[in-house]
Each structure stands twice: as C-alpha cells, then as structure tokens.
C-alpha cells in the first residue's frame, strides 16, 4: 500500500488550523546537520534503526519530512507509523519544496526534541 503524501500547500493550511498535524523532521544526519532551519514546531526523529513510537500520540495526524525530493526517508518512517496504527503521511518534495515556496520556517535552535526514548528511532 502506498504511503499517503501531503502537498506543501495542504500542510501549510492544516498547520494554520487548531490541532494541526505533528511534524517529524527525519532528515538524514548530513543534510540535517548542514541546515539551520526546520518546519515550525517539528520534532527531530533520527531516521535510523527501529522506530519506537511510545511517545508519539496516536490521536494526531503525523507528517514526516526529509530533504529528499522523492521522500525516501520520510515515506519509510510514515509507512512504519501506519503499520503501527498511526495516521501518517510524507511531505511531497520534503523541506526543499517547502523552502522553495517561502513557507514559514524556524531556526533549529527552536527545535523541540522528542523524549529521549519514547518517540525516537533506535
């Protein structure tokens, strides 16, 4: 079953509404470390190993994004979340498309971390 993908325009609209989706920044190490920005309110989740979702709420939609225009990493994470019963999708075009559209961003200093064990990839 293909992983649902959400457009940057639809995600922007949903983030402006109350109860918008939870964003997961799942960029690989190098692209993440060489960037100074992220999507607003995103949690950092290392996209390696087995996904531990114990700290991720099941009552929210989740959108994973990466820096790959083909959403390879974010699709893998979203597929695993769906397998575990979450409502998850991948951002079409990743953060690159988001930045190209000049949509809102935050500096990584504002990055909120997921709890160390719950919600992290091991």
Give short role names for the model-derived ranges.
Residues 24:
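Active-site flanking residues adjacent to catalytic metal/cofactor-binding acidic residues
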Residues 1-17, 21, 29-63, 68-122:
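Rhodanese-like catalytic fold shared by cysteine-dependent sulfurtransferases
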């Amino acid at each position: 079953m293909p992983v649902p993908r959400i457009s940057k325009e639809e995600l922007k609209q949903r983030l402006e509404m109350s109860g918008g989706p939870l964003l997961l920044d799942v960029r690989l190490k190098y692209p993440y470390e060489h960037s100074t920005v992220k999507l607003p309110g995103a949690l950092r989740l290392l996209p390696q190993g087995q996904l531990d979702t114990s700290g991720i709420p099941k009552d929210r939609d989740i959108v994973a994004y990466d820096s790959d225009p083909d959403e390879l990493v974010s699709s893998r994470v979203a597929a695993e979340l769906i397998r575990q019963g979450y409502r998850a999708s991948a951002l079409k075009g990743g953060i690159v498309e988001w930045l190209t559209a000049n949509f809102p961003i935050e500096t990584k200093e504002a990055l909120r971390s997921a709890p160390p064990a719950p919600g992290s990839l091991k």
